[in-house]
Every structure is written in C-alpha cells, then in structure tokens.
Amino acid sequence: MADRLIVRGAREHNLKNVSLDLPRDSLIVFTGLSGSGKSSLAFDTIFAEGQRRYVESLSSYARQFLGQMDKPDVDFIEGLSPAVSIDQKSTSRNPRSTVGTITEVYDYLRLLFARIGKPHCPECGRPISRQSPQAIVDKVLELPEGSRFQVLSPLVRERKGEFVDLFADLQTKGYSRARVDGQTIQLSDPPTLKKQEKHTIEVVIDRLTVKEGAKRRLTDSVETALGLAGGMVVLDFVDLPEDDPERERMYSEHLYCPYDDLSFEELEPRSFSFNSPFGACPDCSGIGTRMEVDAELIVPDEEKSLDEGAIHPWSHGHTKDYFGRLIGALADALGFRTDIPFAGLPQRAKKALLYGHKTQIEVRYRNRYGRERVYTTPFEGAVPFVKRRHSEAESDASRERFEGYMREVPCPTCQGTRLKPLVLAVTVMEKSIAEVAAMSISDCADFLGKLKLNARDKKIAERVLKEVNERLRFLVDVGLDYLSLNRAAGTLSGGEAQRIRLATQIGSGLVGVLYVLDEPSIGLHQRDNHRLIETLVRLRDMGNTLIVVEHDEDTIKVADWIVDIGPGAGEHGGKVVHSGSLKELLANAESQTGQYLSGKKSIPLPDIRRPRDPSRQLTVHGARENNLQDIDVSFPLGVLTAVTGVSGSGKSTLVNDILYTHLARELNGARSVPGRHTRVDGDDLVDKVVHVDQSPIGRTPRSNPATYTGVFDHVRKLFAETTEAKVRGYLPGRFSFNVKGGRCENCSGDGTIKIEMNFLPDVYVPCEVCHGARYNRETLEVHYKGKSIADVLNMPIEEAMHFFEAVPAIARHLNTLNDVGLGYVRLGQSATTLSGGEAQRVKLASELQRRSTGRTVYVLDEPTTGLHFEDISKLLVVLSGLVDKGNTVIVIEHNLDVIKTADWVVDMGPEGGAGGGLVVAEGTPEEVAGVPTSHTGKFLREILDADRISDAASVKAPRKTAARKTAAAKSTTKKTATVRTTNNTATKKAAAVTKKTAPAKKTTRARKA
C-alpha cells in the first residue's frame, strides 16, 4: 500500500496547478488565509475524489440514489483511501433529532431498557411482571406449609350486566362455586345481579393447602385458571383477615396491572423511541413541546397602566378603542382602576384580564352620531383571544403576529420527555429512560458505570453497556461532557455538532480511512483544546489519515505535516507556500502563517482601552433561559465587548437568545420571542441592531457580492445612463441577468446549462449562445470605459475599485469590500462559492457602507471562524472602525487575539451546562486576567504584559458575583443586591481609570489618523 498521498495538477476554483505529496497515517493541517484555497484542495479535490471513487465502485442502480460527486479538476491523485468529511454545514435542523439520536447512544439505551428495564404501572407505581404457571406454583410453594387458599379465575372485572348466561355456562362446565363481588355463591343457585351496576365475578377452580405433595394438582389448577381468564389467576388465602393486603395475590402471564386494569404490550426497543407511534407521546407526537400563549409576552412591561397599553395585543391598530371600552367595562364591573401600573392591580383583575371573566359585562359607548349605546358581552381575556386568533388565522402574517405572544413550552402530558406514560414507568436502577437522557453526558457515563445488576441482567446488558460507555467516553474526550442526550440537535453550535460527528466516527473504530475536518476547534475554549487534539491524535494512531483545515495555533503545532496555502487569498492564492514540518514553516519568510507563529508578526495590543460610560449601557436583568441562573449583565455602549467562557457556559443564550432577540423585537419589529428574562434597560439608547453571522449570503448561484451589497443597482443605473443605452432606450432592468430583456434566454442568465446524466453526476457546460457572459449580444454592445456589464461582473473588487473611482456611490461600496479584505473576490462571483468567513465579511461590508447613526449595536457570534491571523487583524480594524463611529460591537469569542483587543470582557462560566450560567468576571481584559477563578483569565495572563495585569488587578469585585450567587441561590433579593453593588464598584473604578486615560486616548487616535 502506498505510504504517500500524491496530488498532481489540482486546478479546482483558484488552485494554480497544485502538486504535492502528503504522508499517509499522519495528522496533516492545511492552513492559510480565508479564501486562499484550503477548502478547494482539502474538500473539493482530495475528499471529492476519494468519495467519487468509492461511489463509482457501486452499481449504476445504487449510484442514482447517492449524491453524485463531480470529478474534481485534477490530473491524478494516488494513495487515496475511502474519505469521510466532517464539516460544519450539515448540521441537522430536524426537531426530532437529539444528541442521543445523532450519536446513536439513545438507540443503545432503548435496547438496554427494553431488555432489562423493570416495568411499573404508571398509575399506582407497583412493579409489573409476567409469570409462567411454573413460576407461580414455585412462589406459592415457598409460603409457610399448611396455608390454605383457593384458586380463583377472574372472568369479569368491574363490568355492568346480569351475566345469567355466564353462570349457566360455568355450571355446565362442572364448576360449583364462584365469588361475586367478594361473596362466595353456589352456581346451582346463582344470584340475580342488577344490570346497571358493575360486578366482579371469579370462578373457584380449586381449594388447596400449601404442601410438597400438592405441586401437581396446584399446577393443573393454575393452568386451568389462566386458561379461563385469559392469563390471570387470583389466589385467596382464606386464613388471613379480610383487610390484609397479602390476603389476595394476583398473578399474570402478561404485563398487566390488575389494580388499575392496565395491560401493557411486550416491551421492544421501538417502545422507547419518540419517533415511533409505539413510544411517542400521543399529544405532542414525540416533539416534546407545544406552542402556548405566554402571559409574560402579553404584558411585557408590568409598570405600564392599562390606559398606556399594558396588554400588548390590544394596544395598537384599529381595534385599540374597542378593547379600551371592553377593559373599561370590566374595570367598572370588578371595581379596579385602569390608570395604575398593571403590577399594582388586584389578583382577581389580572386573572380576568388575562384569562377571561365568566359573567356578562355591560359596555357603554358613543356611536358616530354621538348617541350612547349599551350592550352586554362576556369578557374573553387576552390569553384565550390570542389562542383563538392564532388557530383561526388564515394568512401567514396574521399567524406570525399572534405567534409573537406564544412560547414553546414542554408538552403538559409528557412534561417534555416526548414519550408515553407507560414507557416512562419502565426503570433501570429507579431511573426512567427520560431521566437518563436528561443527565449530562458525564453524569450519564457515571450512572451507567455504577449499574448494579443481577447475573441474568448483567449477561444481557454487557455488550450494550460496552458500546454506550465507549461512545460516551468519546463525547467527553471531545469536550462535550456538559451536553445532555435529550438536547435538540437544532440548538447546537456548528463546533458542537462537528465534534459530535467526530466522536461518532471514533466510535465506529474504522482504520485506514481519510478524514477531512473543517476547523474542529470552533466554539471550543482554550481550556478544552488539548482534549480535542488528543482525540485527533488517537484517530491518527488507529491507522487513519487526517487532513484538518485549521487556524488554531495549538493544532498547527501538534501536526505531523503542515501545508500552508497562499500567499494571499482568491486570485493571489492557490499556491502551496509550504509543505513540510513546523520547524521549516517557522523559517519560511514567504509564509504569513510562519511569520505569525514565529512571532515576527503579531496582532498588537491596543495602547489604551476605550473608557466605559456607566450612564450608557444595555443591562439584561434576570436572565434565566436554558442554564442562565437569573443573572444581571451589563454591556457598555460605544465599546468593543467580548463575551467569553467555556463551551456551554451560556454565552449564546445570553447574547443571541435574549439580548439580540429582545433588541430585534423592540427596534426592528421582529416577531421572534426572546429567552426568559425580567427586562432589558438601556434599549432606548440604541436605534438599530444588526446580527452578522457566517450563514451564506445567498443559497442560489444568482446571488453574489454585487447584488448583496446593492452596488449592482448603481452599476446598472450607470450603464443605463451611457449614450449607447439611451439611444437604444435601455433602462437599468435591461442590465439584470435575473429578468427577461437583457439576459441570455438560452441559459436564463445563468451562464451555464445543466445537463442531467441520471446515474452520473450532472454536467454543467458553458452556454453556447452567450459563452458564459449571462447577457444577450445587444446588452453586451453597451460599454462604459470600454467594458461591458459582463466584464464588470468578472472584475476582482480591487480592479473594479480603480475602474469606478470617479463614481462615488459605487466607489464607497467597493472601498468597504476592499477594507474588509475581499479585494480578490470577483464582483459577480457566485455566493455559493464563498467561504463562511468571506460571506461574513460581505455582510460586514454592506453594513459598513450604510450611513452610520452611531447608535447601532452589532452582534457577532464567533466572527473569527475560518479566519487566519492576518484576516483577524483586518477584521479587528473593521470592528474598531465601527466602534470609533460611536457604535457598539458585542462579539462571542474564544480567540485570544480578539479578546485581548476588546475594551470590555464579560466572562461566563465557571463550567459548561448546569455548572455554568453565571458571570465569573467582567471588566477590561487586564482585570479579567487578574481573576483566579476565570478560565479565560488564565489564558489572558499568558499573553498580556504582567505589569498591565498588576495595575488592573485591584478591580476584583465583580468576580464575586458567581461565588455569591451560588451561595445565595435561595435568596433572590440578596442575589440582585450583590450584582448591583459589584457593578457599582466596577463602575467607580472604571470611571477612575477613564479619568486617568482620557488624555492619552486622544493621542492614540491622533496617531492612528
């Protein structure tokens, strides 16, 4: 078998005829600037060819069902293994997917519970078990010798009727006695039963005494009783008193609770699946949640009075007056005021306003002629009103409007567990499958490791437990110990989802595979990095080849082989700058990566931090969504704030689910519902909020940077104003490739034509009419400065910038695109070919070129994903530019280069999952570095100057919030007080720092200019 992976002549995307040899069974890191061609080489060339060759080996029939891979543009590749790619894009958004189902741990748990679980009755909680006739006889013979009992066969249990035929039938079969409603009767003289009452009838099969010789007769009697009653037998011990619970013993051949008359189906693994009708909760169909109206959203601000519109759905629009009259009539009927805050209303009034009032109320109003009119009506209440209007809504807009007052709440039937009550009553060591799935992965591993089983169960569970424990161990190893198995897959971050798939791959135990990974360290705190690296090394040691596209310094330093692609991005990249060991990379003068790793280049620390103004800040009060523990957090305005903390500590919940969603709802009129919190102060100080993420800027090849940023509209107008266009009567629409008129109709403005090949991959060929130009001949005859519209779309942005420098509207857009480091991207480059980092910078550029009010909040979630040290340096310049205009930038980040340049840091923690959700430290990076309990502070200490930390170390007050909060968890009042005082100390000290630094700040700004 070849010991090298040989690539020759790779020309995919911007690769310039790349040839390289890579060692097999090694950890290889591909690095380089964003857009330099790393993914083109790793994913679109090496992985695509490995996958394609495997698929080619299948029959043509099987191939048509598999996603076909295009043959990459490469001369040849040798030494390829079957390839598995683990990227971030293919995360499941299915609401039925959970961490347990993705990792298959839940499948093994279902098997475990189906085979060794102990069923209980969901009503009375008694254990249920099935017994064979022999087992029943053996149990009876264990009782004290001489105990007298009768064997009864229960034929009727609590059913109405006279049962005349049944008594006659029993007599003909030779039975002489029966027990009716607890009274023994002779069948020769049956009682007359009342037809309308419920009766219980048991026929007496035999009367016996416990002794060794009675075994044969007892077995026959029990078998007869079981046969008559469909698998049930009752033993009545006549010597015991009537009220003794041991007097009657019921046995069953099936899973059946005789006390509640519930019978159970045979337990199978599918009974525990919430994706199967056999196990799913019938009310929520296994989703676990339902949309319910939330009173908190109907009255978002309890300080408002009813006259000021406290009840939000009734406070605006043309129905405002109508509801005002209704509320006034209710106030008269119940005797409460409408001009005091909603919070001060009596409980009875609140209940009636929200949930309705049964008795009719008298409503008075004046019609348009000034006459007074009176009518009576029931008062519906805001909650039932929203529910009714939501269910009756005919348009999406109307439905969305009322969904804004609803929250997803756990299904009341299954309490969010997704399963039937019968299934939840099956336990292993007193825990149901839902309770095991709700544990964190580390707790679940501990629980399964400590299982105490009898010999039979141990034998059955042995292999299942081995599989589950291995999988759980791998999940812990990749730093996901804080996740629970029932966590919905849609709520995972890209990095978490990728590491879950990584753990699943290790669990599969394959050898000789080529794994291609895309930045597995995303979303991982420096503290957990070593665990991930150990996992990658273990995968390699099993005999696999790993190609990791990565910018993380620790991972690059551990690699056996490093490939640096560059030297620039886009047109300026696509070459192999370095392929070899770390030592050679550090000495390579041409490699940007080498210069940053060796310390020749670095991202500088700002000389001075922007001061924080205590009077201008956004404060979230009482944040308690997911794992947040009722915390108050302030974000100063007009500075760059970094929110840090280990994975799962609650950063995204705080910033995205609560702060951003609240601001989007208040300022942008969005309909989404923020996470649970008491209130947000300071939102009147900002007028817009923008969320810049790494999702694609468009999902169709027709979307491109020119159309996304809006610069294409100006370009089309410019072309329409040329003399030639005016002579021909062309309008700006003529120069669009999306509408009929100017576009080439043969390819509908795509420039390529798709030819379907059934079981071969679809082939895209350039359109033979326009030859890929997208426009018809007449449109292309219009020129500006000698270039057609197609030539302009094909220009790199830096070239277009000089071309259009005389046109301010266009130049402004292009300058911002160039400032964020996208000069190499072509104006008309399809959005689908842009990397995540590039898409994010296109969004940033389109925001940057808007006229700034200086009151905008920008929220960025891990903006350094996919960015090289050099790209991060450019990004920080852009973000500083936004802040210098007076805006506020809040970033969720693990990258220390970004954290060290921030003006303010909010560090969440101390751990992930249930161990997080508190603010461990807040202050400048120097202040956070001085906090011993902060994991982020520990790593900041290593990169900040020691004297800067010692100067700032005096501010330690806010750190106590986390410690105090856990101690004072029972006393809420105490809790809020702590936070307030700590904030005050921080504020005073920050103000003091501000005074000292103000003059110095001016000089740094001047130097910059």
Curated annotation (Swiss-Prot):
Coiled coil: none
Family matches, as PROSITE patterns: ABC_TRANSPORTER_1, ABC_TRANSPORTER_2
Keywords: ATP-binding, Cytoplasm, DNA damage, DNA excision, DNA repair, DNA-binding, Excision nuclease, Metal-binding, Nucleotide-binding, Repeat, SOS response, Zinc, Zinc-finger
GO biological process, one term: nucleotide-excision repair
Positions annotated to bind ATP: 32-39, 645-652
Chain intervals annotated as zinc finger (C4-type): 744-770
Biological source species: Streptomyces avermitilis (strain ATCC 31267 / DSM 46492 / JCM 5070 / NBRC 14893 / NCIMB 12804 / NRRL 8165 / MA-4680)
Protein name, per record: UvrABC system protein A
Cystines in this chain: none
GO molecular function, one term: ATP binding
Protein's gene: uvrA
